[in-house]
C-alpha cells in the first residue's frame, strides 16, 4: 500500500505556498483534506496507470504498492492541479479588483500567461514521464 503522504510529500518539494504552510500550522487535518482533494484530481488524470488506483480515503492510502515512477507521475499531476487552482484564484482576484490601470492589467495578464506556461511545461514533463512509464511495459501490449 502506498500512502497519500508519500505522493503529497513529493509534490510539496516542488510547491512553495505560504497559504499551505499556514493551513498546516493551523489545522493539519484540513491541510491533509485539501492535499487529498488535489490528489484525487491527480488520480483522475492518470488514466494510463497500469495498476488499479483504488484507494481507502479513511486510511489515506492506495490499495496497491505504487512504483517510484507512478508516485512521481501522480505527484506531478498534483502539482498541476495546485497550479491550476492558483491560476484560477489569481484570475478571479484580478476580475474582482477590476483594475483600470493598463500597466497593472498588462502585468496581471503577463503573470497569468507565465503561470499558464508553467502549467504547460509541467504537462509536457508528465507526458514524457508517462510515455517512459508505458514503454517500461511495452511487451504487455498486444499489437
Predicted segments, located by residue:
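Conserved short "hinge" loops at termini or chain/domain junctions
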Residues: 1-66, 128-143
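Weak global preference for isoleucine
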Residues: 7, 23, 73, 80, ...
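Eukaryotic calmodulin/EF-hand partner-binding IQ helices, IQ-like basic amphipathic helices, and related
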Residues: 41, 99, 103, 118-122
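Short, surface-exposed, charge-dense and proline/glycine-enriched linear segments
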Residues: 52-64, 80-91, 117-130
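Amphipathic protein-protein interaction modules
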Residues: 68-115
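Polybasic, proline/glycine-rich intrinsically disordered low-complexity segments
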Residues: 106-141
Amino acid at each position: 500500500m502506498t500512502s497519500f503522504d508519500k505522493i503529497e510529500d513529493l509534490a510539496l518539494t516542488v510547491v512553495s505556498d505560504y497559504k499551505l504552510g499556514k493551513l498546516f500550522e493551523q489545522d493539519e487535518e484540513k491541510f491533509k483534506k485539501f492535499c487529498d482533494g488535489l490528489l484525487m484530481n491527480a488520480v483522475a488524470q492518470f488514466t494510463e496507470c497500469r495498476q488499479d488506483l483504488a484507494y481507502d480515503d479513511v486510511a489515506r492510502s492506495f490499495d496497491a504498492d505504487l512504483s517510484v515512477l507512478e508516485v512521481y507521475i501522480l505527484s506531478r499531476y498534483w502539482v498541476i492541479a495546485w497550479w491550476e487552482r492558483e491560476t484560477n484564484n489569481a484570475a478571479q482576484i484580478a476580475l474582482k479588483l477590476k483594475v483600470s490601470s493598463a500597466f497593472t492589467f498588462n502585468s496581471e495578464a503577463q503573470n497569468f500567461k507565465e503561470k499558464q506556461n508553467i502549467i504547460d511545461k509541467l504537462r509536457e514533463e508528465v507526458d514524457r514521464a508517462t510515455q517512459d512509464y508505458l514503454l517500461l511495459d511495452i511487451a504487455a501490449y498486444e499489437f
